[in-house]
UniProtKB/Swiss-Prot annotation:
This is Coiled-coil domain-containing protein 3. Residues 1-21 form the signal peptide. One of its GO terms (cellular component) is extracellular region. Glycans are attached at residue 100. Disulfide bonds: none annotated. It comes from Mus musculus (Mouse). The keyword ATP-binding does not apply.
Length: 273
């Protein structure tokens, strides 16, 4: 094998396998924070106390796992609850409790990342082994930084209680009842919209099928018309050929008759006795 080809083959063999690109479902549509908040299993408001490296596992698998140890792609976080869990949540822990949130890091379609000593709003869920994981509803963000805008949004959507000193969120909840009504409507409205979109999609598929059949019928009609035109053309051509043939036959018969008249025998002269 030539040296350049050998080097190229060695380079390809030594290079890591390409990572799988992010592939969302074909029917995926983005959801608002409010709708995702309603669908999230639990919402907590907590401060990150410490970060701990985490080995690759079921919830943080990546094709390039051999880099995880070097780059620190996966980690867990020790967090402290700044308020009781959000109203309606299934996690019954009071403010000041410390929890371990696993499954953080960088993934193919999204990232769950936090910084130590900062506070966040978390969408979390619990697995069958009672591990707390980020709940990335609809393959979207599950962690929100502690900003005034997010405080206003989440304190309006959910009722936090018994917050730590200086972390009261109820100051933004004057429109909570209105937001709660909107929150309860969110899933039903989204479901109705999705059903309507699915119905429209099915109708579009039916229309596309009918249009395809219509095009096929048009092609068949065109072929029949072309065949009919060709048949008429052939018929006219045969008529002309037949007419010319009849004319030739008529002319030939007339010529034969004239020739026959010209060849009548001469009568012998009459002799008197």
């Amino acid at each position: 094998m030539p040296l350049p080809l050998l080097l190229a083959a060695l380079c390809l063999a030594a290079s890591p396998a390409p990572a799988r690109a992010c592939q969302l479902p074909s029917e995926w549509r983005p959801l608002s924070e409010g709708c995702r908040a309603e669908l999230a299993e639990t919402i907590v408001y907590a401060k990150v106390l410490a970060l701990h490296p985490e080995v690759p596992g079921l919830y943080n698998y990546l094709p390039w796992q051999y880099q995880a140890g070097e780059g620190g792609l996966f980690y867990s976080a020790e967090v402290e609850m700044l308020c009781d869990q959000a109203w309606g949540s299934m996690l019954e822990v009071p403010a000041g409790s410390r929890l371990n949130l696993t499954g953080l890091g960088y993934f193919s379609c999204h990232s769950h990342t936090v910084v130590q000593d900062y506070s966040y709003f978390f969408f979390v869920r619990m697995d069958e082994n009672y591990n707390l994981l980020p709940h990335g509803v609809n393959f979207q963000d599950a962690i929100f930084p502690d900003t005034q805008e997010n405080r206003r949004m989440f304190s309006s959507l959910f009722q936090f209680a018994n917050c730590s000193q200086g972390q009261q969120l109820t100051t933004f909840s004057s429109d909570w009842e209105v937001q709660e009504d909107n929150r309860l409507m969110c899933s039903s409205v989204q479901k109705a919209l999705f059903e309507e979109e699915d119905h429209v999609k099915k109708l579009q598929q039916k229309v596309a099928t009918l249009e395809k059949r219509n095009r096929q019928l048009r092609e068949r009609v065109k072929k029949v018309k072309r065949s009919l035109r060709q048949a008429r053309k052939n018929s006219r051509h045969l008529e002309l050929v037949n007419q010319k043939l009849n004319e030739k036959l008529g002319a030939s018969s007339a010529q034969q008759h004239i020739n026959a008249l010209g060849r009548e025998p001469v009568r012998a002269p009459y002799l008197h006795g």
